[in-house]
From Swiss-Prot:
The keyword Oxidoreductase does not apply. This is Putative glucose/galactose transporter. The chain crosses the membrane at residues 11-31, 47-67, 70-90, 96-116, 139-159, 180-200, 225-245, 263-283, 300-320, 321-341, 349-369, 378-398. It holds the Pfam family MFS_1. Keywords: Cell inner membrane, Cell membrane, Membrane, Sugar transport, Transmembrane, Transmembrane helix, Transport. GO terms for cellular component: plasma membrane. It is found in: Cell inner membrane. GO terms for biological process: D-glucose transmembrane transport. It is a multi-pass membrane protein. Its main location: membrane. GO terms for molecular function: D-glucose transmembrane transporter activity; galactose transmembrane transporter activity. Belongs to the major facilitator superfamily. FHS transporter (TC 2.A.1.7) family. Intake of glucose and galactose.
Length: 407
């Protein structure tokens, strides 16, 4: 079988980004689902995101080195296999009714996503040749399609089978925990199927086809890369923090049940999908850094309004932040890795480590929310945590993205 062309390779990678989005957003369903089952505090529930995104920090550098040796195509296949393993482990985790087991399975699942992320993002940029930001935004739009459909299927398959009330017995809680078994087992099978397809496609290893550079330069000597990695840290942290507590916020402030509240996640992540498809067109006319600056500023305004105004308007404002999140990750990534040459795979590994922001920022917001709950204060004040994240993104878009003359 001949090697796949660049266009077909880019097309096949959309399945990778779709699955990453679909699986990642299910954490936003797991948090309100497992919180009452295991009687968790907001902080303890946010450990779901801590374990999932903590894998990025622990495994990002590891996979960056591994992929630089085995190449992007095999990195993608390896990522799908590890992801399938983590998904399959949800079955015994639910059977034994162990929150710790769930967190362990999540870490393995997330390690697979880290591998896919580390291989997938630079793979797209190297295949794009001059259209890095636009093409990465386009394939990330399919990631957003996954994050849009994830809450719909997650709420239907998980919340619809939940029968637990406030005074549920241990047997009822274990039964509700098992509602995640079949959805995640299905994801395991789908991941293995994608691994087989990617292997048979024989994707081109574009990095090995690049001419070798004669000079070696430290990755961290590129300031625009360092600022960009920090930008990814704060972007993922802010986005995940808002998504993690959106369902719980709707439940608390609007007295909605979990399944009804979960539907609003569709608008949050669906907004990102619309924004990415729109961004793939507008980036032909607007400079990526200017587009990023506008979206960061818009997010700051929306979150500030939510904190100040409160009520339904606040929650709808927070939901609309998803639209402006749309182009942030691919734009920051492409600006941070521009002109890095053979350092690109290692840079991708470091950026994958920076996604640990999704592990650290939500627990901080969770701890703040617990404190506000204890003092019967406005829970929306906790959204000041992700607000600070977007201020850094604005800095990167205005100044941090600039490359030094000799880089």
């Amino acid at each position: 079988m001949q090697k796949t062309s660049n266009t077909l390779a880019l097309g096949s990678l959309t399945a990778l980004f779709f699955l990453m989005g679909f699986i990642t957003v299910l954490n936003d369903i797991l948090i309100p689902h497992l919180k009452p089952i295991f009687d968790l505090t907001y902080f303890e529930a946010s450990l779901i995101q801590f374990c999932f995104f903590g894998a990025y920090f622990i495994m990002g550098g590891v996979f960056g080195n591994v992929i630089s040796k085995i190449g992007y195509p095999f990195g993608v296949v390896l990522g799908f296999v590890i992801t399938a393993t983590g998904c399959a482990l949800f079955y015994p985790a639910a059977h034994f009714g162990s929150y710790g087991f769930f967190l362990g399975a999540l870490f393995i699942l997330a390690s697979g996503i880290v591998c896919l992320q580390t291989a997938g993002n630079p793979f797209v940029t190297l295949l794009s040749k001059g259209k890095e930001a636009r093409n990465l935004v386009l394939v990330q739009a399919f990631n957003s399609l996954g994050t849009t459909l994830g809450p719909i299927f997650g709420s239907l398959l998980i919340f619809s089978t939940t029968k637990m009330g406030d005074n549920a017995s241990l047997i009822d809680k274990l039964a509700d925990a098992k509602s995640v078994q079949m959805p995640y087992l299905g994801l395991a099978v789908f991941s293995l199927l994608l691994a087989l397809i990617m292997y048979l496609l024989k994707l081109p290893d574009v990095e090995k086809e690049m001419p070798k550079e004669t000079t070696q330069k430290s990755l961290f000597s590129h300031k625009h890369f360092v600022f960009g990695a920090l930008g990814i840290f704060f972007y993922v942290g802010g986005e995940v923090a808002i998504g993690s507590f959106l369902v719980l916020s709707f439940e608390k402030l609007l007295n909605l049940d979990s399944q009804s509240s979960a539907h609003y996640l569709v608008y949050y992540w669906g907004g990102a999908m619309v924004g990415r498809f729109l961004g793939s067109v507008l980036m032909n006319k607007i400079a990526p850094n200017k587009y990023l600056a506008f979206n960061a500023l818009s997010s700051i305004v929306l979150i500030a309004l939510a904190i100040i105004i409160g009520g339904k308007i606040a929650l709808f404002a927070l939901t609309f932040v998803g639209f402006f999140n749309s182009i942030m990750f691919p734009t920051i990534f492409s600006l941070a890795t521009l002109n890095l040459g053979h350092l690109t795979s290692k840079a991708s590994g470091v950026i994958s480590m920076a996604i640990v922001g999704g592990a650290l920022i939500p627990p901080i917001q969770g701890a703040v929310t617990d404190m506000l709950t204890a003092t019967e204060s406005n829970l929306l004040y906790a959204y000041g945590v992700p607000l600070l994240c977007y201020f850094y993104i604005l800095f990167f878009a205005l100044k941090g993205y600039k490359q030094e003359e000799n880089s």
